[in-house]
Amino acid sequence: MPTAPIHARDLTPGQTRVSIAIIAVLFFIFGFVSWVNAILIPYFKIGCELTHFEAYLVTFAFYISYLVFSMPAAHLLKRTGFKRGMMIGFWVMAAGAFLFIPAAMTRTYGIFLGGLFTLGAGLAILQTAANPYITVLGPKETAARRISVMGICNKGAGILAPLVFAAVVFKVTDTDLFARLATMAPAEKAAALDELIRRVVMPYACVGTALLALGFLVRWSPLPEIDTEHETADVAEANADKTGILQFPHLILGALGIFLHVGASVISVDTIIPYAQSMGLPLLEAKAFPSYVLTAMICGYVTGILLIPRVVSQLTMLRFCTGLGVVLSVLIVTMRAPVSYGSHVTDISLWFVVLLGFANSLTWAGIWPLALDGLGRFTKVGASVMIMGLCGNAILPLGYGWLADHYSVRDAYWIILPCYLYLTYYALVGHKKRVW
C-alpha cells in the first residue's frame, strides 16, 4: 500500500527543496527522451526511406500514447501512490527503449514506432504524476515560477539530446554518404542503410538500462506522497454538486489549450531541421537548430523566474507569450530575407521559428495553474485530462507533414497560427469560464 499522503503546506522547507530537486531530475529525463525525436525524424527519414508524413509518425507514435494512457495512469497512481507509479513508468519506458534493438537489427520502422509508443506510455504515467505534484508544491501564485524551473531542466536536456545523439550516431563522413545514397545500387544502398540504422543499438541499450535503474531509485527516494486533491472549505462548497470533470469548463478549455500549445511547440522543434535543410544547410549543420529553439525557451523560463510574480503576474506573461506566438507565426510564412548569423547563412524566417521557443516557454506554466484552479478532489483526474492534451504533439506534426508534402515546408507553418490564436483567447477569456 502507498504511504498516506500529506498536504504540501505540512512539508518542512528541506522536504520541499528535496522534492523540487527530485522532480527537476524527472523533468530532465522527460526532456531528453522527448526532444531526441527532433533528430530521430530526419535520421529515420533517411535510414528507413520515408516521406515527410511517414517520418512525422515518430511524434505521432510517441505522443498518441498520452491520449491512450493518461486516464489509466491517473487510476494507477491512485492505487499505487506517486513513487510506485513513477517506478512503473520508468520500467515501461525501459521496455520501449529496448524495443529499439530488434527494430534496428531488422531496420523495421514499425517496431521503432512501437518502441516510441511504449516510451510515451511510460512518460504518460510520469507526467500525470509530476505536473500536478509540482503545481501544488507551494503557493498557486508562484506555480508558474516552479514550472519554469522544471522547464529549464526539460529544455536543457532537450538542447543536449539531439547533439548527444548526433555525436554518438553520426560520423563526419555521413554528409558524403547521404549525398551518394541516391546513386548507389540497391544492394549497396541497403547495406549502407542497415549499418546507419544499427548505430542506435548501443545508445538505446544504455538508455533502457538507465531507465530501469531510475525506477528503483525513485521508488526508494525521499520523495514524499503529497495530497494533490486537498480541498479548502470554499472549494469543497463550490464543488459540492460536481459529479464529473466535464463540469469544469476552464479545465476542458485548458486541456484544449495544452493540445494546441504542445503541438505548436513540437512543430517548432521537430520541423526546424528539415526546414533548415530546405535552405541548403546539410544535416550535420542543421542539427544545431533544435537546440537554438530550446535555448530560446530557456531564456523565456529564466525571464519568468526573474519577473513572476514580483514584476508581472503569470497571467500577464501568458498573454504576452501567446500574442508573440501569433505575430511570429505570421512572420514565418510572410517574411523572406537572407540573413547571416554566426556560421549560418539562412532565410530570416528560420530565426522566427527559433524565436517561437521564447513564445512557447511560459505557456505551459501559465495554463496549468489556471486549469487546475479549484478542482479539489478532481485534481488527479483533471491532471490526466491535461496530460491527454499532449496528444497534440502526435496529431499536429502529422498535419504539418501533410502540408509540407503537398505544398512546402514553409507554407506548412500556417498550421500553428490558429493554435496561438486560441491560446490567446484562453489567456484573455477562456480561463475565467466556470459554467458552460
Regions found by a protein language model. Name each.
Residues 18-46, 130-131, 161, 268-276:
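Extracytoplasmic
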Residues 37-41, 162, 166-170, 243-291:
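Extracytoplasmic gate region of multi-pass secondary transporters
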Residues 142-174, 383-396:
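Glycine-rich segments within core transmembrane alpha-helices of 12-TM secondary carriers
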Residues 57-75, 291-304:
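Central cavity-lining transmembrane alpha-helices of secondary-active solute carriers
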Residues 69-82, 300-314, 404:
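Helix-to-loop junctions at the C-terminal end of transmembrane segments
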Residues 68-110:
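Conserved MFS/SLC helix-loop-helix module at the cytosolic interface between two early adjacent transmembrane helices
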Residues 91-106, 323-342:
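C-terminal ends and interior cores of transmembrane alpha-helices
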Residues 125-139, 361-376:
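Intracellular juxtamembrane helix-capping segments at the cytosolic ends
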